[in-house]
Structure formats: structure tokens, C-alpha cells
Amino acid sequence: MKSSKLHLLTCSLLTLLLISCSEDNRADHAAQYPPNTSQKADTKFLRFTDESRGEGVMEAAIATYEGKNGEKVELISAVHVADTAYYERLEKLFAGYDSVLYELIKAKGVKPPEKGRRKRGESGGMVSWFQRYMRDTLQLDFQLEAIDYRAKNFVHADLDAETFQRLSEERGETIVQLMLKLALAEFKISKEGKSKTDQNIGLKLIAALFMPDSARALKYLFAQQLENMESLMAGLGEGPDGKGSVLLTERNKKCMSVLRERLKRGDKNIGVFYGGAHMADLEKRIFKEIGFRRTGVRWEQAWVVRRAEQTPAKKPAKK
């Protein structure tokens, strides 16, 4: 049961991260200000409020950072499958930025997917299958289907597929290797008694599948576990060689390179729309590389888990 639990968690973590470098050109885009050493990079970017009885709210953070000349950068923690209302609110928010830097590993020259387009019937491997499962079973929307990535102010700030593959091959980094690394990290945390993972998650998942309101029950279980994702995924930004992973570290380097380019171009209000697992490392880089200060954190509801209201049974008509 424990091995199946770990397999489920690691597959889920990597899948959510993958939905969605070349060397860091720091010399070309040097930080405008000295490093911010007065603040600690400890922002929490995902939280679940358990309201008991199988209900609760999962929220994603939007953290604001400001430079001395009025520049503003916001880290918008993305939840890749979420309630429709969450994406509708984000779309309104995005319209107000000079530029929105987004994550998406795609081939060079290929446009991002059109909003609302679904590719049912295509296999796409394990990742695509899991995406469809999450969307359909949990009755949620996909980020790539609900957000207009072709908006004029959207700027690609991720590795292209060719670079990602090349760097991964150079380092011998595979999905299996990363899944094993995450599983070992979870095992270590569990052994130290610090794990937040429900030891009975496997049984609860099976039970949830057979509930009349299975979508609500499964959303509740997944939401409880997603908080644990941040600390586990942060481990991918570390490594014995100090280089971190391609999946997280190199993509974040690319994102920061594009961010410096946009600041150099004169953008004053920039949104960075990246998965929550990337945010802890991105915050560190914002402090260290461009010297901005964190000035606030606000929250957006991504999943609202509620039981359906019970409709009172109709009284039989009087004869």
C-alpha cells in the first residue's frame, strides 16, 4: 500500500509540473539593484483550508515584488487543473499586465494551444492520460484550455522542447529518475516523522471512487495532498552537483532571463504565471538576481470543494 501511495503521489506531482536552458545570460541582463538580503524567501504558494466533512478550499498565492523605480513583478502560482471561476479571474488579472511570462515546453516556432481547444482521442502518453483523468473525473478545467495563451501580452518564458530534451539527455535526467528521487524524498520525510501524507490515502482513494459524489470526494483527497507538493518539488532544485534539475532549475533560469529582458525593455508591471512548484526557487532568484522586495501576498481560490446541497424530499400530494 505504501509503494502504491508513493507511486501515485510522485506521478501526480510530475504530471502537474509537466503540463505546462540554455546557459543563464546574467552578464547581459545584470540585476538593477543589489541583492535583497533583508527578506527570507519563505513564501507559501499553495494552501488548503480543511473545513471538515469532506469540504475545503485550496488557494494559490500571488506574491508581489517591487523595485526601487516602481517596477512590479508578481509571481502567479498556477494550478494546472482548477475550477472554471479561478481561470476566469486570472484572465481578468492578466489583461492588466504589460507582459505575462508563462511556462510551456513546446517546439521552437510553434504557437501555444488555442483557448478552449481539447484534443480528445489522442493518446499522448501517461501525462496526457492523467491530465484527461484529472479534468474529467474531478470535473475541473485545464489551464491550457481555459487560458488564452495567444493574448498579445503573453510572453513565452520557458525552455523549448529541443533544448529541454538536449539538457535532459546530457545530464541523464529521465522521468523515471525524477520519480524515484521524489519517492525517496517522501520516504525520508516519512521516516523522520515529518510527512504530511495521509498513510491511508490508497484506501481513501478507492472508497472515493465509489461514492455517489466521487468528484467532490476525490478533489478533497487530492487537495489535502497538494500542499505537500511544494516541499517535495523544491528538492528538484537541489542536487549533489549544485546544478539542480532541468525540469525545475534550468526552466527557472530561462524564466529569469526573459524577466530581465522585459525589465530592460521598460515593462513596469509583469506577471509570471508558473506552476506552484517553481515558485520557491523563483522567489530566491528575484531576491538575489534583481534585488526586488516582497511587498505583499494575496490568495485566489483554485478549488472549492463543497457537498451538493441536499434537496428535501417532496411530500406526497394530498389526495
Predicted regions and their residues:
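Bacterial N-terminal signal peptides that target proteins for export
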Residues: 2-9
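Generic low-complexity segments that are intrinsically disordered, proline-rich and/or Lys/Arg-biased
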Residues: 8, 35-36, 313, 317
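A cross-kingdom marker for long, charged
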Residues: 245, 249-319
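Short, well-ordered coil/turn elements that cap or connect secondary structure elements
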Residues: 16, 68-70, 265, 289
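Structured, acidic catalytic/metal-binding patches in enzyme active sites
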Residues: 25-250, 295-305
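C-terminal motif of bacterial Sec signal peptides marking the signal peptidase cleavage site
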Residues: 18-20
